[in-house]
Amino acid sequence: MTKKKKIRVVTGGVFDILHVGHIHFLKQAKELGDELVVIVAHDKTVEERKGRRPINSMYERAEVLKALKMVDEVVIGEPNCISFEIVKQLNPDIIALGPDQNFDVSALKEELKKKNINAEVIRIPYAYKSDVAKTSKIIQKIVETFCE
């Protein structure tokens, strides 16, 4: 009797100030397969892309994600880049993109093909919309409420 191969889903993101939008996204990503691996953005990458350091360090964000039932493994990304080497090592069957991740799916698929990474790319749409389902909105609300 042959053992069925587990379907591995890989996703990545900042996941700073974890909120209900993140939870809904991670649940949907997990439903795509058997194992969910999350690549947490390196602090330097966050600073470069968002123009600010994250509220929680990459180690704190990784620890919070590891505590979630739907997350099987957490890896911290490389500084200042999307590391295709990490993705290749993780050997995903599916790469799940969040609704606010501004990747050109066609370009990403081409790059994966060049790197010999055979994974399906799936963009997960917003499952939960609210003013508190976006980290920047949470920060803005905190500043408006407590800093004026």
Curated annotation (Swiss-Prot):
It is an enzyme of class 2 (transferase). Keywords: ATP-binding, FAD, Flavoprotein, FMN, Nucleotide-binding, Nucleotidyltransferase, Transferase. ATP binds at residues 14-15, 19-22, 100. Its cofactor is a divalent metal cation. Its EC number is 2.7.7.2. It catalyses: FMN + ATP + H(+) = FAD + diphosphate. Transmembrane segments: none annotated. SUPFAM superfamilies: Nucleotidylyl transferase. The keyword Flavoprotein applies. Disulfide bonds: none annotated. Gene3D superfamilies: HUPs. Pfam families: CTP_transf_like. One of its GO terms (molecular function) is FMN adenylyltransferase activity. GO terms for biological process: FAD biosynthetic process; FMN metabolic process. InterPro entries: Archaeal_FAD_synthase, Cyt_trans-like, FAD_synth_RibL, Rossmann-like_a/b/a_fold. Pathway: Cofactor biosynthesis; FAD biosynthesis; FAD from FMN: step 1/1. Homodimer. Belongs to the archaeal FAD synthase family. HAMAP family: FAD_synth_arch. Catalyzes the transfer of the AMP portion of ATP to flavin mononucleotide (FMN) to produce flavin adenine dinucleotide (FAD) coenzyme. This is FAD synthase. The gene is ribL.
